[in-house]
Amino acid sequence: MHNTGKRYSETAKKVAAGRARKRRQAYEKDQLEKQQLEAQEAQRWEEGARTPNQKKLIMEQKKTEKLRAKKERDQLLAAEEEALGKGGRGKRY
């Protein structure tokens, strides 16, 4: 404590108030740092989310294009079979 010749009871309130103030300031400083870190982390996540993976996009495009082409082929084949009839043996006499 202080060695100024004052009694403990005279300085105890000031010392306690000073310690409490320092604790409060340290707590507020920690909270501010945590908020800043969270903001930085959120910003990094947003930056990462903005740029999609080009390779995956190209793969997805190719996949959808293949599926579309297959559906078209199946439709054409079904229409052709329908136009020709079932085929089979033909008429029996």
Curated annotation (Swiss-Prot):
The keyword Ribosomal protein does not apply. It is found in: Nucleus; Cytoplasm. One of its GO terms (cellular component) is cytoplasm. InterPro entries: LSO1/2. Residues 20-83 form a coiled coil. Residues 25-49, 57-73 have a biased composition (Basic and acidic residues). This is Protein LSO1. It comes from Saccharomyces cerevisiae (strain ATCC 204508 / S288c).
